[in-house]
Amino acid sequence: PRLGRFSRDGSPNAIAGRKRPLHTIIPAFLEKDQVRIAFGIMGGWNQAQAHAQFVSHIVDFGQNIQAAMETARFTKRTFTGCDVELENRVAGNVRAELEAKGHKLTMRIGFSDDFGGGQAVMRDYAAGVNYGASDPRKDGAAVPELVIKEWGK
């Protein structure tokens, strides 16, 4: 429901004057040199975490936007505790390391829509190429189109 994301007293997200609720309507943009990426990943509580994971897979690991969208995800659904939900595609050694650090893991089947779903578009101005990515966790598709010559060029 609208305005349903406030929490009761005692919570960091409790309703109060001059406050705004934690909310996850967050389209995002990345830019470096001649490359622009616009993306969004829906998924409620998981949305900001999925955004950060998507960006990390591009920036830190050099993945293309489709690979970054498909990479196994994890989420922390609460402010407290050590519970972490993971897609079962997360490598076994990573799961073992998390458990050794005291995390309580809940496994979800691969490409679970519990971890949101998103789309991304990328424009490489230097190459004159557009790219698209669609998350297999939801219904959607990245459909290729001809690049239209930019105005004035």
Q: Where do the protein language model's features map onto the residues?
A:
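Proteins synthesized as precursors that undergo proteolytic processing into mature forms
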Residues: P1-S112
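Terminal-appendage/accessory-domain detector
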Residues: Q63, D83, N88, G92-K153
